[in-house]
């Protein structure tokens, strides 16, 4: 699972392999997997011409690193996971063009795009899901917190193409 630096996807089990934390007390009793962790090309505010140019360069570099991770791990990359807004330790926002680049990479390589909406879903951004502010659509959404339960939503059209998929 390709994921990003400065991400927060949880503090238990496999989610720790996707979360950046430097406090060993939080992960010492859990397995940690060496999955590809990619540069985080979030926007830097204020959005000046200089900051935007830096963001675009970082997006291109992140997409290149993802391509390299896919090529060096053939048939081993199942998904890319990202929070539409990284909300741990500040707000990190992404450009629509970056999410579209992720969507294209996933489509070209037959891997899933997962949006972790645990902190951003259920109307907190003004839309039901934060990804609805962008053009790229995920294959899977994870959600929780505000719903009092956690869950996973999957793209019906995509998964109906797969006989006996786990979402039937």
Model-inferred region functions:
Residues 2-168:
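Conserved N-terminal phosphate-binding loop of PLP-dependent enzymes in the Aspartate aminotransferase
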């Amino acid at each position: 699972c390709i994921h990003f630096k400065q991400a927060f996807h949880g503090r238990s089990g496999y989610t720790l392999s996707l979360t950046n934390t430097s406090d060993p007390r939080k992960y010492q009793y859990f397995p940690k997997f060496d999955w590809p962790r990619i540069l985080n090309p979030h926007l830097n505010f204020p959005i000046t011409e200089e900051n935007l140019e830096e963001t675009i360069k970082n997006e291109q570099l992140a997409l290149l690193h993802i391509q390299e991770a896919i090529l060096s791990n053939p048939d081993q990359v199942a998904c890319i996971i990202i929070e539409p807004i990284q909300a741990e330790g500040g707000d990190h926002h992404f450009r629509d063009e970056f999410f579209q680049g992720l969507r294209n990479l996933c489509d070209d390589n037959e891997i899933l795009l997962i949006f972790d909406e645990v902190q951003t879903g259920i109307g907190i951004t003004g839309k039901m899901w934060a990804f609805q502010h962008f053009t790229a659509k995920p294959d899977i959404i994870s959600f929780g917190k505000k719903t009092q339960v956690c869950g996973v939503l999957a793209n019906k059209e995509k998964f109906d193409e797969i006989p006996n998929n786990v979402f039937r």
